[in-house]
C-alpha cells in the first residue's frame, strides 16, 4: 500500500471508523471485546488490515450525526448513504451495494406500486432516527 494512501486514510496511524449503530443491516451485534459487529465493522476492519494500521470504532447513534462531524477530525472513514447535502462535506466512493427497501401503506390505500408513490404531490416519510 502506498504511504500516501495510508497518510490520507489514516493520518493518525490508526483508522478511525465512524459506525452508524442505527442501521441493523450493517451493525448487528457486538464482538466479545465489545466492539460493533456486522458488515460495516467487518468492511472497516478489512480496510485497516490492508492499510496495515490498527482500527478504532467511533460510534454514532445516526448517520446524520456522522455527517455532522465530517470535517471535525473525529473520524477518517464512514459507511453512510450518499446524499446530495452530505456530499457538500463528504467525498463518497461508488456504492458497494444496493439495499432493497419498500413502502408501507395503510389498509385500503390506492397506492399499489413504487411508481405511484414516487411522483409529485404524493407525500411519504421515513424514520426520524435514520436522518
Question: Residue locations for each model-derived region?
Answer:
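Solvent-exposed coil/turn segments that connect beta secondary-structure elements
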Residues: 20-24, 82-85, 97, 106-109, ...
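Short, glycine/charged-enriched secondary-structure capping and boundary segments
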Residues: 30-33, 70, 91-95, 118
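A structural signal for short loop-to-beta-strand junctions that line the ligand-binding cleft
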Residues: 6, 39-40, 87-101
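Extracytoplasmic small-molecule ligand-binding "clamshell" domains
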Residues: 1-81
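Flexible hinge/capping segments at coil-to-helix
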Residues: 96, 105-124
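Short loop->beta-strand "edge-of-pocket" segments that line small-molecule binding or catalytic clefts
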Residues: 14-21, 37, 115-131
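Short acidic active-site motifs
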Residues: 65-67, 88, 113
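Residues embedded in well-ordered beta-strands
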Residues: 16, 102-104
